[in-house]
Amino acid sequence: MTYSPGSPGYPPAQSGGTYAGATPSFAKDDDGKSKLPLYLNIAVVALGFAAYLLNFGPTFTIGADLGPGIGGRAGDAGTAVVVALLAALLAGLGLLPKAKSYVGVVAVVAVLAALLAITETINLPAGFAIGWAMWPLVACVVLQAIAAVVVVLLDAGVITAPAPRPKYDPYAQYGQYGQYGQYGQQPYYGQPGGQPGGQPGGQQHSPQGYGSQYGGYGQGGAPTGGFGAQPSPQSGPQQSAQQQGPSTPPTGFPSFSPPPNVGGGSDSGSATANYSEQAGGQQSYGQEPSSPSGPTPA
C-alpha cells in the first residue's frame, strides 16, 4: 500500500546534496619571511669552498720564454683563496640554529677576497701565464662577494625580498564532499511498476476502482494517494475466464453499493452499472454501461 506525501506513514524523501568542490589549501611559511637570505648564505659557503678546490689547479704557469726546460705551475692565488675560505666558514657558522649572524663581517671578507683575486690576475709578473683554474676561481670569488653584499642589504632593509609564493600542499585537508543526489525518486510502496511486455491485443488494461476523490482505490497508472491498486497479473483471455466481484475498499473507507435499477423490462439490465470484469478489464462505479448485444427494441 502507498502513503500520500505528508501522511504519518509516508517515508521521508532523501534530499540529494550538492557536490562540494575540493578547496585546496596553500601552505604558508611559518614566519612569513622570505628564504632568499638563507639561500644566499648557502651560496656564499658553496662558492668559498669551490674557490678553495680550484686553487689546486694550475692558476699560474711559468712561461717558456724564461729559458729552456722551464715551465709548469708557478704558484696559487694565495691570499685571495684564504680570505674567500674564511668568508665561507663565517657564513656557514651563521647557518647553525641559535648561532650569531655575521652577515656584515662575511660581506667585508668576501669583498676583500674578490679584490685580492682581481689584483693578482692583473699584476701578473713577467714570464708567468694565467692557468685555466684561475678564471673560474676569480668568478667564484666575485660571485661570493656579490651574494654576501646582497645578504647585508636585505638584512639592513635597503632592498626588499620578494614575497614568497604560496605553494600548493598536496597533503592539505580537502573540503568535505556533500551527498550525491539520487537518480530519480523511489516509487511508493504498492505503486505498480512498469510492465516488461505488452498484453495480448496491443492493449494494456489496468484495474479500475472507486473514484480518486475519496482518496481510495484509484487507477494503477498514476498514484492518487492512499492505498494504490495493484496491477492484475492476468490479462487478455485469462481475465475473461475469471469473474471478480466488486472491489471492496479496506476497513475504514466508505463502501458504495450499486445504484437502483431505473425503469423496468429489458432496459433495466442496460441501465445498471456492470461491476463484473469484462473482457477488456474492470469497470468502476459511475462508468457508462456497455450497450447490450443484439438489436435494440424499437
Curated annotation (Swiss-Prot):
Composition-biased stretches (Low complexity): 202-211, 229-246
Pfam families to which the protein is assigned, alphabetical: DUF5336
Subcellular location field: Cell membrane
Main location: membrane
Residue ranges of the TM segments: 42-62, 77-97, 102-122, 134-154
Biased composition (Polar residues): 268-291
Protein name per UniProt: 34 kDa antigenic protein
Upper lineage: Bacteria, Bacillati, Actinomycetota, Actinomycetes, Mycobacteriales
